[in-house]
Structure formats: structure tokens, C-alpha cells
Amino acid sequence: FNMESDSFEDFWKGEDLSNYSYSSALPPFLLDASPCEPESLEINKYFVVIIYALVFLLSLLGNSLVILVILYSRVGRSVTDVYLLNLALADLLFALTLPIWAASKVNGWIFGTFLCKVVSLLKEVNFYSGILLLACISVDRYLAIVHATRTLTQKRYLVKFICLSIWGLSLLLALPVLLFRRTIYPSNVSPVCYEDMGNNTANWRMLLRILPQSFGFIVPLLIMLFCYGFTLRTLFKAHMGQKHRAMRVIFAVVLIFLLCWLPYNLVLLADTLMRTQVIQETCERRNHINQALDATEILGILHSCLNPLIYAFIGQKFCHGLLKILAIHGLISKDSLPKDSRPSFVGSSSGHT
């Protein structure tokens, strides 16, 4: 394909983009190989809309409660609480964009270029900041449990600097989306929100494909496996009273992370290898990859509403904190509060939850 001899809009002619929405996958019109006729065995768009709506409601409720409980527990707030606060905020911001993405599944992108840039930016920032914060939590628990180091991690200014750095790095990594996203109006199909990078669109998009796979999955995953691996080893050797509970939380963190993001990133890796000619591309493989990307992306979206369940609802401290808030506002009796409840719903930065 020669971008210099054809205009960007001409390149969209004849393509079936009526059901295309935001994805890091490359759409069928950017294939370097011979054109393939896309199969119609795609995920029902109304089913996807229902999933988006459920994730939106669960994420909005769960992450709002997490933020509320952490903000109320100022006295006993731990380092892990600060990370969880930022994680919940990132997931909440992403959840607010889901109704727009759901509407675009049905009607195409009808919201203009400004919202195209804004909601795409929020989705990218959530992707990067969320996983980077998960990695920071694993490092914090590793230092506290394996090395019994709390002096460094308990310095408030350092924790704030780390969180601000994560948000800054996430914005930097998402900057290309803000710069190059716009509403595209193909002929005879619904408009889409996608990148327009001029003559080098295909090459730039391949570069941007590598960024989320590296910074957004591989590196944080290696950090989490390393930290949680040594943390579990230490817990097995030490006879701590809350060892089994800590192990359950850690296993839940790693397991849910892998279940949500590993399938999508494996398919994304296969797609990248195919587009770089490492794996021979056929029409059958291309259609299978496109269908797998659509299906596994839903798992990644589900992760935003599962985080409150992993980090909060599994532990008793969150429930205690929520009960305290209800008691303060007179919604329940103070007699129902546990006597040994603590303000921080994760206990301490050690991760013994």
C-alpha cells in the first residue's frame, strides 16, 4: 500500500467499518498483505453494549466506594491505600467513558473529534496508570514483607512523587493518541474514532502497538511475578498469623490480572508477529485474529470493575471502613461496628490483608 499516492479518505472506500470501535488492533484496511474479505462472525454489538453497561455500573459503584473509604481513613492510611486510591481513580475515569464507547458500537462515532481525543486519552491513561500502579503495589509489599523495609515507602512525599510520576508517564505514553486521533468519515459506513498520522500511518501505528505491550503488560507483569514470588516464599518460611489471608489476596491479584490481560496481549503479540511477516499471514488467520482481539479486549475492560473486589472486598478492613462511614452518618448503629476495626482497609503497606 502506498500512502503517498492515495488520500487517507480514499483508503477507507469499500471497507466494512460499521461495527468498528476503539481498539489497539489495526483495522482491516491497513493490511500490508493481499486484501481479505472480513468474516461476519463478529461479536454481537448489542451483547458488547450490555457488557459495557454492566462494567460501567460495577466499576462506578465499586471504585467510588473504595475512594470514599480511603479518603475517610486519613489517620491510618497506608502507602498501599494511596496506591489503591489512585488505582480506583484511574478505573473510575475509564468507567465514565464506557457509555460513549457503548453508543459508538451501535451508531458509530457520532461525538466529534474533541470527544474522540478526550475519551481515547482517558482510556490509554487508565491502561498505563492502572497496571503501573499494580506494579508499585507489588513492589511496596515486596519491600515490606521480604526486606521488612518501611522507612522508605512510608515517606509521604516519596509516595506522592511516585503517583504523580505514574500519572505523568501515563499521559506521556498516551500523548500520541491525543495528537493523532480524530473522527474519520468513510464512504457509505458509520464514522469511526481513529488515528490519522499522514503518510506514515501504518508505520507509526505499529510503533504505538509496541508501547502498550512493553510498558503496559510485559514489564509490569515481570515486576509483579518477581515481587509476589519472593513475597510468597517469605510468607511460607515465616509463621505469620495472617499468612494464609495474605496469600489469598496475592494469588487473587496475579490470577485476575493474568486472566484479564494475558489473553488479549497474547493475541496482540500474534497479530504483531503476523503484520511484521514473522508469521505467515492468511485470510483465515487474519479473521481469527480480529475476532480474538474483539473477544479478549472485553476481558481487559472487565479488569477495571474487578479491582475493587480484589483489593477491597476480599479484605475485612474495607468492610470495617465502610461500616464506620455508615455509622458516622447514622445509617447503622455504632454497636454493629467491630471493636478491633482499623481505619486503613488494607491494614498496612505490608499487604497482610
Curated annotation (Swiss-Prot):
Bilayer disposition of the protein: Multi-pass membrane protein
Main localisation, per the record?
membrane
**Where in the sequence does glycosylation occur per the annotation?**
N19
In Gene Ontology terms, what is a biological process of this protein?
A: neutrophil chemotaxis
Q: Which InterPro entries match?
A: CCR1-9-like, Chemokine_CXCR2, Chemokine_CXCR_1/2, GPCR_Rhodpsn, GPCR_Rhodpsn_7TM
Keyword set for this entry?
Answer: Cell membrane, Chemotaxis, Disulfide bond, G-protein coupled receptor, Glycoprotein, Membrane, Phosphoprotein, Receptor, Transducer, Transmembrane, Transmembrane helix
Q: List the disulfide bonds.
A: C116-C193
Give the CDD domains listed for this entry: 7tmA_CXCR1_2 (cd15178)
Its biological purpose is as follows: Receptor for interleukin-8 which is a powerful neutrophil chemotactic factor. Binding of IL-8 to the receptor causes activation of neutrophils. This response is mediated via a G-protein that activates a phosphatidylinositol-calcium second messenger system. Binds to IL-8 with high affinity. Also binds with high affinity to CXCL3, GRO/MGSA and NAP-2.
Q: How does it assemble?
A: Interacts with IL8. Interacts with GNAI2.
Indicate what this protein is called per its UniProt record.
Answer: C-X-C chemokine receptor type 2
Q: Which organism is it from?
A: Gorilla gorilla gorilla
